Amino acid sequence: MGTDSRAAGALLARASTLHLQTGNLLNWGRLRKKCPSTHSEELRDCIQKTLNEWSSQISPDLVREFPDVLECTMSHAVEKINPDEREEMKVSAKLFIVGSNSSSSTRSAVDMACSVLGVAQLDSVIMASPPIEDGVNLSLEHLQPYWEELENLVQSKKIVAIGTSDLDKTQLEQLYQWAQVKPNSNQVNLASCCVMPPDLTAFAKQFDIQLLTHNDPKELLSEASFQEALQESIPDIEAQDWVPLWLLRYSVIVKSRGIIKSKGYILQAKRRGS
């Protein structure tokens, strides 16, 4: 892997942006870890294997070009939705903002997901709570810039429905009253509450908000874990220079049968100072 790693390291030393996409994990076959114990473990494994695959297939032309934006893809697993089957599929995504960057990440994540899957719009996007400093309670002000961008995407028909994650009754009520496009769902982590809070259930029922459950950790991808995965896959690199900005996890479900046809991750990272 030495030569591959050196070529990948040289490209990453010059580029400013990294786009990583796993393709459809159901197409990975034996590459995929059979039973990842957590979502974080699955994600880290996916990042490393995608980096390994990409670095092993770098062409001499790419090294000569030194592109500013690197497209790191598990090429054999890429799978676009057949336009003839689009109406039969539900395309859902959950967006995790990782870096302390602007809300424009929301648009770039949705645009990239549509491009990767070959669709004009996503049926549903749930926004994980944005990162905040330790000891600070999540407020409406934290959510507003991201929600406004999601609203713009609904109005421009890039998304059909938008939802939230891990909001309590007060937070959900504040967002609902302020928002132009109302949340149609709110995910609740059952690790933190075995039973749905009655006040949240009552509010959601009153305003027709679907309550869903999830088991994502509070921090699915940290800056440190991304840099460790990068360093392990490509030793010839200053991994600490790279910061993940956002992560999007998508799933494509056959509506009539409830079967997952495709699922994967898309990620964007930036090099500091670039």
Curated annotation (Swiss-Prot):
Gene Ontology, cellular component aspect: glutamate-cysteine ligase complex
Annotated positions of the Phosphoserine modification: 59
The entry's keywords: Acetylation, Glutathione biosynthesis, Phosphoprotein
One Pfam match: Aldo_ket_red
Annotated pathway: Sulfur metabolism; glutathione biosynthesis; glutathione from L-cysteine and L-glutamate: step 1/2
One GO-annotated biological process of the protein: negative regulation of neuron apoptotic process
N6-acetyllysine modified-residue sites: 263
Gene Ontology MF terms in the entry: glutamate-cysteine ligase activity; glutamate-cysteine ligase catalytic subunit binding; protein-containing complex binding
Subunit text: Heterodimer of a catalytic heavy chain and a regulatory light chain.
Family per record: Belongs to the aldo/keto reductase family. Glutamate--cysteine ligase light chain subfamily.
Record protein name field: Glutamate--cysteine ligase regulatory subunit
Origin species: Mus musculus
Lineage: Eukaryota, Metazoa, Chordata, Craniata, Vertebrata
